[in-house]
Amino acid sequence: MADNSTHPIMKILESFGLTDVILAFFLSMVVGLLLGALVYMILTWMSRRRASATITRIPVHQSRSTTRSSSPRSRLGYSRHSSGYDRRSNNSLASAAFSFHRQTSSSPIDYGDSTGRKSSFRASTFHPLLQCSQIAREAEEGAQGSLPRTPTLTTSPGAAGSTSTVSSMITPPRARNRPDSFWGNSNLRGFHAGQTPPPAYDSIIRAYQETTT
C-alpha cells in the first residue's frame, strides 16, 4: 500500500502558495536594506558630529584666560629673541660703520714710507701690528730726543788726552739699529741678512770623520 503521508512543511507551503512566499521574501529583503541604510546614516552623522565637536574653537572667555596665563612666558621668550636679534644687528651695523669711518678718515700718507710715498697695501686695510711698530718707533725716537746732550768742556790744549777720554765717557751710546723682524713693515723679509750662514755640508762631513777616527 502506498504511503500517502506528506511532510508538515510542505502542507504549510501549499497552504500559502508559491507566489505569496516569493513576494514576502523580497519584501523582507527590501525592508532590511532600508533599515540598515538608516542605521548607517545615523551612525555616520553621530561620528561626524563628535569629530566636529573636538575641532571647534574654544570659547572666547576660555581663550582669553589661556592667553593671559601663557602670554608672559611667550612674551618673555619673544622679547629675548627679539632683543638678541636687535643686539646682533646693532653690533653688525656699528662694526660696519666703524670700519667705513676708519677707512674714510685715514689720510693717504698715514702708513706711507719715510719719503712720503703712499703705500696702497697699508692705506687700504687696518694693520694693528704696523701701528704697534710705528708707536714703538715713535717712543724710541722720543726717548732718544729726551737724552741729555753732551756738555762741551773747555780745557787747555795740553790736556787733549783727558778731554778725549771724558768725551768718550760722557757721550751716550749710539742707538742700536733694530734688526728686521721676520714680519717686515711692508712685506715678508724673512730672517735678517746679517745672520751667519750654516756651515757647509763638506765641513760637517769632515768634522764627523775626524771625530770618528
Curated annotation (Swiss-Prot):
Bias type Low complexity, positions: 63-75, 146-168
Motif (Bipartite nuclear localization signal): 48-68
Gene Ontology BP terms: embryonic hemopoiesis
Transmembrane parts of this sequence: none
GO cellular component: nucleoplasm
Annotated segments matching region Disordered: 59-89, 139-201
Sorted UniProt keywords: Nucleus
Subcellular localization: Nucleus
Ranges in coiled-coil conformation: none
Domain of life (superkingdom): Eukaryota
UniProt family annotation: Belongs to the MYCT1 family.
Name of the protein: Myc target protein 1 homolog
Lineage start: Eukaryota, Metazoa, Chordata, Craniata, Vertebrata
